[in-house]
């Protein structure tokens, strides 16, 4: 009788452990999904919505399936077979996932005309994650069936199972974000949690003396893959990348050409920073932004919110000697890359942290540049009237704010229109300059009525051999005053992800229509030639 009691207690303890590690794996896979998709589709709130919605659908289906399966057959063997299958599928994601994403995106590109990123991320998420999360969704209802011995204590048992699953989910939320992804990357994070599921299954099958060899082989192979020296590349079609890495916040890619060093945080679109190896101007928006120090009454203190790799900071030191530059960058790995590959001068004070939080505690500046981006959009908290009011309050008399807007669109109610109207509601004197040959728009704002006249006079006074002579007249001729309007962003209401996605959708739709036209004329094989 005593032995039987110990056996029941041991069995129940193992079921509780299953609830804990399964809950942990659910959240780890969800966070891994966001990191797997982010380099291709961004990590915006829209993509997160797709991921969470897909996973909730899968879990709901799994809950129904698991409950019915447990009622039909109360033997836990089927549950642990499902967990073993989940382990195999999860372990395959790092190797097959990028090709599935490319395949789904390529297929949808042939006929999806609008909201391509939404549909492509949704299709990829369904293809990769519905099945394993549906299997994990069967765990809780199955365990409730197996662990409940009588109606007298079923409430307590269910509560304990739910609590352990939730505690596991909490750990599975923090562990990938702060430990495994920064330490070993997304690919090995999937393998770590696949190995956990495989070991749990193996433990069960050892006690039952069933499926021992198969589960042992699977557990050993997955564990071996964790330590195997394989090279995982999100941009698998790219050769010769200088750096491909991940941080808590970003996918990071550094590549070099004969003339420049380039940082990207997305494999599909956008370049975050460019450094010209020969020094000098880049021909990009950083050059246009140099009009801000010329416009300011003084240029002694410069603050950059969104330092990136420090191209603008380096240019400020080069073309405006004597100024002190502070840059705030939330991603410490980008700061490290800026020192190692982009030649960020030691004179630049690089602060790791959130731009708005730093601004609140900082002093006064002559120039403040706002160039903070989360993938394709400005973070909502750095696009509102409250934020720009705070910037204004940290500018010295005669100071200038310059904002880089990376998505140019002429459509009514576009992202840039919202930003222009919002800034114009805070600063009385604003103007924009379109960057030639790119999609960027630079906005200059000041409370000094003499600011733009000062810029004109200083451009006229530039020496003929001054490097800025080649770019500043171009900026001057491109300046257009901002009148302002009723599209205002606030801390409470700032739909920047939707606005940014709308502009990106316009760009992608144009590119895809060109692609479809090529296929109609020359056939699909023309893309491979």
Protein language model regions, located:
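Surface-exposed interaction patches
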Residues: 315-316
């Amino acid at each position: 009788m005593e032995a039987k009691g110990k056996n029941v207690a041991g069995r129940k303890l193992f079921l509780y452990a299953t609830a804990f590690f399964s809950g942990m794996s659910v959240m780890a896979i969800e966070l891994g999904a966001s990191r797997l998709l982010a380099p291709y589709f961004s990590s915006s709130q829209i993509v997160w919505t797709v991921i969470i919605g897909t996973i909730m659908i899968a879990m709901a289906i799994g809950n129904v399936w698991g409950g019915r399966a447990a009622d039909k057959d109360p033997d836990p063997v089927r549950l642990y077979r499902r967990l073993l299958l989940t382990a195999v599928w999860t372990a395959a994601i790092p190797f097959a996932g990028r090709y599935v994403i490319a395949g789904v995106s390529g297929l949808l590109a042939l006929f999806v005309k609008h909201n391509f990123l939404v549909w492509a991320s949704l299709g990829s998420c369904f293809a990769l994650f519905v099945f394993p999360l549906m299997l994990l969704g069967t765990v809780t209802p199955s365990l409730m069936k197996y662990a409940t011995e009588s109606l007298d204590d079923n409430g307590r048992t269910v509560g304990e199972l739910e609590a352990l699953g939730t505690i596991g989910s909490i750990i599975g939320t923090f562990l990938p974000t702060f430990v495994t992804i920064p330490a070993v990357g997304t690919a090995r994070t999937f393998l770590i949690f696949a190995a956990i599921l495989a070991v749990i299954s193996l433990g069960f099958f050892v006690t039952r003396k069933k499926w021992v060899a198969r589960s042992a082989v699977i557990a050993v192979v997955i564990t071996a893959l964790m330590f195997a020296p394989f090279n995982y590349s999100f941009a698998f079609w790219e050769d010769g990348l200088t750096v491909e890495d991940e941080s808590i916040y970003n996918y990071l890619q550094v590549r070099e050409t004969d003339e420049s060093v380039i940082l990207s945080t997305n494999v599909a679109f956008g370049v975050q920073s460019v450094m010209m190896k020969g020094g000098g101007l880049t021909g990009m928006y950083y050059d246009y932004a140099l009009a801000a120090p010329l416009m300011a009454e003084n240029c002694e203190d410069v603050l950059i919110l969104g330092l990136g790799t420090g191209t603008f900071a380096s240019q400020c030191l080069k073309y405006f000697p004597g100024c002190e530059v502070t840059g705030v960058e939330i991603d410490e790995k980008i700061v490290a890359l800026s020192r190692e590959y982009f030649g960020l001068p030691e004179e630049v004070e690089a602060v790791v942290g959130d731009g708005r939080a730093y601004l609140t505690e900082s002093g006064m500046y002559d120039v403040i540049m706002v160039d903070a981006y989360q993938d394709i959009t400005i973070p909502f908290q750095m696009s509102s009237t409250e934020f720009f009011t705070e910037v204004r309050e940290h500018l010295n008399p005669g100071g200038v704010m310059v904002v880089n807007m990376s998505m140019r669109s002429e459509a009514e109610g576009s992202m840039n229109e919202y930003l222009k109207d919002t800034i114009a509601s805070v600063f009385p004197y604003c103007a924009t300059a379109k960057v030639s040959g790119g999609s960027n728009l630079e906005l200059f704002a000041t409370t000094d009525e003499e600011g733009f006249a000062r810029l004109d006079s200083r451009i006229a006074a530039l020496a003929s051999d001054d490097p800025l002579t080649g770019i500043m007249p171009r900026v001057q001729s491109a300046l257009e005053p901002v009148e302002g309007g009723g599209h205002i962003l606030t801390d409470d209401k700032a739909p920047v992800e939707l606005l940014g996605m709308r502009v990106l959708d316009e760009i992608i739709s144009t590119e895809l229509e060109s692609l479809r036209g090529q296929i109609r004329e020359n056939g699909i094989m023309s893309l491979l030639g």
